[in-house]
Swiss-Prot record:
Its cofactor is Zn(2+). Binds 1 zinc ion per subunit. Zn(2+) binds at residues 191, 201, 204, 207. Pathway: Purine metabolism; 7-cyano-7-deazaguanine biosynthesis. GO terms for biological process: queuosine biosynthetic process. This is 7-cyano-7-deazaguanine synthase. It comes from Pseudomonas syringae pv. tomato (strain ATCC BAA-871 / DC3000). Pfam families: QueC. The gene is queC. ATP binds at residues 12-22. NCBIfam families: 7-cyano-7-deazaguanine synthase QueC. Belongs to the QueC family. Keywords: ATP-binding, Ligase, Metal-binding, Nucleotide-binding, Queuosine biosynthesis, Zinc. GO terms for molecular function: ATP binding; ligase activity, forming carbon-nitrogen bonds; zinc ion binding. Its EC number is 6.3.4.20.
Amino acid sequence: MTNTEKRAVILLSGGLDSATVVAMARAEGYACYTMSFDYGQRHRAELDAAARVARDLGAVEHKVIGLNLSGIGGSALTDSSIAVPESPSEGIPVTYVPARNTVFLSLALGWAEVLGARDIFIGVNAVDYSGYPDCRPEFVESFERMANLATKAGVEGQGFTIRAPLQNLSKSDIVKAGIALGVDYALTVSCYQADDQGRACGKCDSCRLRAEGFTASGMSDPTRYF
């Protein structure tokens, strides 16, 4: 690392979207510091996927933060008593994890301030997505304003930018962009119910969006199913 390198902290779940974001940041010349969270999610295979993606795309450092969001509950992803739906539903789905992106971005902000990074990347999307309130442009813009009010760096004029490069892309556009940038999607796990080997259920909303993205893009889908 040198003082001339520009650094970015990137939220990396291990799924298709966040892997694409790492590749985009790398293509822009960023030294990539990736951050994942062991938050009590039922699909823990995504943590192994995140480590694989970070390694494959040359992250400078990959950090896994332990959180116990299952202690809060309220989501099918953190509470085993709530079933993951296998068909689209009206409104905000039960797979929404309360305040998840707010918590994740806050910790990424802390690491960015320590690293001297001014850019934080997140793979939220408002086109082909599940309807989560913390994936909307208004949320990203509001968090950026808060970040620059709540930090020493922000107060001293070294502002942060929250980058959401997938915000207005369709899932097929994301797939095409990632493949053009060399993302190996076989390393990724998107399924909400993935088994320990990272194989997907093929039924949940995340699996549906992923499959539709590959089909619409005309690209080969490397997803493994159980």
